[in-house]
A protein has these predicted regions:
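Aromatic-acidic/polar surface patches that form glycan- and anion
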Residues: 19-23, 90-93
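Active-site/binding-pocket entry motifs
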Residues: 10, 181, 193-195
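Short glycine-rich His-centered loop
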Residues: 2-21, 112
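A structure-centric signal for secondary-structure junctions around beta-strands
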Residues: 24, 161, 213-214
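Short catalytic helix/loop segments, enriched in acidic residues and glycine
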Residues: 20-35
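Radical SAM [4Fe-4S] cluster-binding motif and immediate context
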Residues: 185-186, 190-218
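Residues that mark the start of a beta-strand
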Residues: 1-2, 40, 213-216
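Glycine-rich beta-alpha loop elements in corrinoid/cobalamin-binding modules
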Residues: 33-183
Length: 218
């Protein structure tokens, strides 16, 4: 089983939002790619499934955690999960995401934890050396993630997969960025059915209009 996790969000006591809790487009694209490939997966949206709840932020008293608790997220992970993908686009979300990953790794020590998103792409060296992440997907991830799943399940070499970074005997290995997909029509549509999209919409937490593989028009 493949489990995809969108971590909880971060807020301050002043009400300032560290990152607006929009629907996670990157994970939705990954879910769409898995769906088209016929692979079994589940999505846990740690923010969207409980947008109205806030909890103490681990290790700090000036921030709050928005969404599901770590325990609630972990309780939703199927026991047969062998691959757990976590998204983290913004570095402001990394401290919370890192703690979540540590707890997930402790509960599922045999599962491979894969990080995607801009934060991991930018600082994969730090992520791999200072967290429980097993593999970082660099840049566009839809095709790379599928290749990675196949290699992990077939126990074949990861060095032949473009677009990832990992540690092998404490040696950092990065295979470079994969080639960008030029034709957007070849990309699987985001699987929004796996996300609590109505929860976002009802609270006016929505994305802008995307006309390509770029920042949305707001």
């Amino acid at each position: 089983m493949i489990t995809l996790i969108n971590p909880p969000g971060t807020k301050s006591f002043s009400g300032l939002q560290m990152h607006t809790p929009n629907p996670p487009l990157g994970l939705a694209y990954i879910a769409g790619a898995l769906k088209r490939a016929g692979l079994e997966y589940i999505v846990i949206d740690g923010t969207g499934e409980d947008l109205d709840s806030v909890h103490p932020y681990p290790g700090r008293d000036d921030f709050l955690m928005q969404g599901l608790t770590f325990e609630e997220i972990i309780s939703k992970i199927p026991t047969d999960s062998d691959i757990i993908g976590v998204g983290c686009n913004f570095s402001t979300l990394w401290p919370l995401t890192k703690v979540l990953i540590e707890k997930v790794s402790s509960k599922f020590p045999k599962a491979k934890i894969i990080l995607g998103g801009e934060h991991g792409t930018a600082v994969y060296q730090d992520v791999l050396k200072n967290s429980c992440v097993d593999i970082v997907v660099l840049g566009e991830a839809e095709e790379t993630f599928l290749y990675l799943i196949r290699a992990l399940r077939e126990m074949s070499s990861l060095k032949d997969i473009k677009g990832i970074a990992f540690l092998e005997s404490d040696n950092l290995i990065a295979t470079g960025l994969s080639e960008r997909q030029r034709n957007v029509d070849d990309i699987a549509l985001p699987d929004w059915h796996s996300f609590p999209i109505e929860e976002y919409i009802s609270r006016h937490q929505v994305n802008g209009v995307n006309l390509g593989r770029s920042m949305p028009l707001l």
